Amino acid sequence: MRRLVIKVMAAQAMGLVENPWSDEFTVVTYDRRGNSRSPRPSGWETTSVVEQADDAAALLTALALAPAAVFGNSYGGITALDLLIRHPGVVSRAVLHEPILVSVLENPGEVQAVVGSVVEAGMAAGGPQEAVEHFIRFAAGDDNWDRLDPDLRHRMASNGETLFNVEMGTFESYRPDDATLAGITTPTQVLVSQESADFFDEAAAWLAARLAVEVVQTPGTHTPQWDQPEELVRTIRPFLRGPS
């Protein structure tokens, strides 16, 4: 029996390599609301983690795929976390890789200022599409951006309007309370990459402590699905398999 994994990814984290999964898992991906091939709804000017999680739950339910294992990266990590909290019935187990929990950091303003300066420089250089490139080079590294397929780079850059004008600035305040996190019973793994910025480690440690799990490290950057796909799958495969 093949296991099902759904990937909940941030707009800047698409393009997860499928081959390392294909021997054992059926992998489902989707374009989040207003990104890539998912049309932007009329009048849609803001979003929330709750809306994003509701979308993912509705997809799994409509396709009769629940419960499924969930892998969430970056903004997708907090979407997956909200699935665990409000839609536990659609998730069999979850891997949360570097969820963007800015509000739990000791100095969230410093992190937001750094990211803001990167985005502002990109906007000044060429608007939202150029800002996407600046942002991904900052988050994932120059090598990762440079080796992406040109068509994928273009598609990701085209999401700049949604990323910067709808999503960014709305997700960063997301912070479930301790009691809510302690009530999660679905098996969950918290993951960080070895080459990522320290604030990802800080947020992961905060979350793992409240879920009563250990932080697991994987090689690579904020986007290990690009630079270390086989190592990423090797790291999380035993957990995704679950009990025999």
State each model region's role.
Residues 1-40, 45, 59, 238:
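Conserved HGGG/HGGXW glycine-rich cap/lid loop of the alpha/beta-hydrolase fold
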Residues 99-154, 168-170:
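Helix-rich cap/lid subdomain of alpha/beta-hydrolase
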Residues 155-211, 216-220:
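Conserved serine/cysteine hydrolase catalytic core
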Residues 38-44, 106-107, 201-202:
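Conserved catalytic-core motifs of eukaryotic protein kinase domains, centered on the activation segment
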Residues 66-108:
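Conserved hydrolase catalytic core segment
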Residues 31-35, 100, 219-221:
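Short beta-to-alpha linker loops that shape the active-site pocket of alpha/beta-hydrolase fold enzymes
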Residues 210-244:
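Catalytic active-site module of serine/aspartate enzymes centered on a nucleophile-bearing elbow/loop
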Residues 50-68:
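Conserved acidic catalytic loop of the alpha/beta-hydrolase fold
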